[in-house]
Swiss-Prot record:
Protein name as annotated: Cysteine--tRNA ligase
GO cellular component terms listed in the entry, alphabetical order: cytosol
Lineage: Bacteria, Pseudomonadati, Pseudomonadota, Gammaproteobacteria, Legionellales
Subunit structure: Monomer.
Top-rank lineage group of the source organism: Bacteria
Gene: cysS
EC number: 6.1.1.16
The UniProt record lists the keyword ATP-binding: yes
Protein biosynthesis listed as a keyword: yes
CC cofactor note: Binds 1 zinc ion per subunit.
The species this protein was found in: Legionella pneumophila (strain Paris)
Family: Belongs to the class-I aminoacyl-tRNA synthetase family.
Amino acid sequence: MLHLYNSLTRKKEPFVSLRPGKIGMYVCGITVYDHCHLGHARSMVAFDVMVRYLRSQGFDVTYVRNITDIDDKIIARASERGVSIDELTAQYIDAMNNDTHALNILPPDHEPRATGHIETIIRLIQRLLEKGNAYVSDNGDVCYEVDTFPEYGKLSHKDIEGLVSGSRVEIVKEKRSPLDFVLWKKAKPGEPSWPSPWGEGRPGWHIECSAMAMHELGEQFDIHGGGLDLQFPHHENEIAQSEAATGKPFANYWLHVGMLQVNGEKMAKSIGNFYTIADVLKEHHPEVIRYFLLSSHYRSPLNYSEENLLNAKKALIRLYQAVKDVPPQTADSKLDEYWQEQFNQAMNDDFNTPVALSVLFQLAHEVNKSNSPALAHTLKNLAGILGFLQKDPESFLQSGLAEEEKLVIEQLIAERLQARAERNWAKADQIRADLLSKGIELEDGATGTTWRRIAE
């Protein structure tokens, strides 16, 4: 049975969906004012694998991942660039789609944008005003009054009184409490705005996600996810406003992905230590990046380094070598039940991908010993749930080399062929050994000599 670590209760719990066989999942997406960095990729890959696994277990998953396309950062960046907000967001949405496609991240079933749900957001704010959980401030903003929700803090488990007394939140004189947050921002000159019962303005960030999640999945759904940095205040505020409006639990399970770090610090645009997905893709195969991102449990911090990416590359080479000579899978090919069960046990333990990867390596060892097509097909199928081992093995094993390097290898193969023809076995063996020392393995066959990279 699947068990998930629920941030709400701080423990692993058996997963029971609201509707048998069906799962509603909402994940906070990106704010499109810049290119996605590898920290975004970690979250997107983690939830992609969760969706793939749940579907492999027979669940009908409705996966929603939003796009924040109106925000202070977007407005500021568009102004800096001298472009319209629509131009800016379109550019970075296209870039995000290119990144996710390259990383083999499945598209969500629904990808709502905040600007497409203004009426839904306004209706939700009206409900909160009618119930007494929100107020119109002196400056025209509509704010949520945190003191009206006694359970505030139940997700992040923070000392709320300490936050207020320590002034660790922004003090705004128009708010009744420092913890109150804006639901609707009064329009400012030159900024985008929409008509509302409270005048022209635009939605606050927190209310956008609540409104879009409820629009796509209903007032209650199964799983809400995002990066650990969103737990407070974003997800805490989502719970407060959603449950105040409906009187029901918002999401049953809250999953949070640990931070990607560089030298022990969170990778973030605000710090300036981030690597864009596009830049990393220039240097590394997409499946290598996926493997690296899954090499640590999704809740744990993960350190970015070239060494860790190299280790991921070597690991994938070993897996690809195990399946390189396997005949194509046929309709009647059966998967090995024992290895499926071992893999499922790992994934049922809160999507434990490091253990799942160790199962794949044990299976690869068996494939190498037995050369069994059934085991090899099982290996490819299980790895496919993690989103890799899906390329042509020869293509992958020759990837990552410049064309000039490939030409040198082909030239050396030709020289070796000539040496063999001249019965100069010492030279032929030396060329093979030299290439092997550089991680290039030669294989002689009836149709000639082929080569592939191997794990050094």
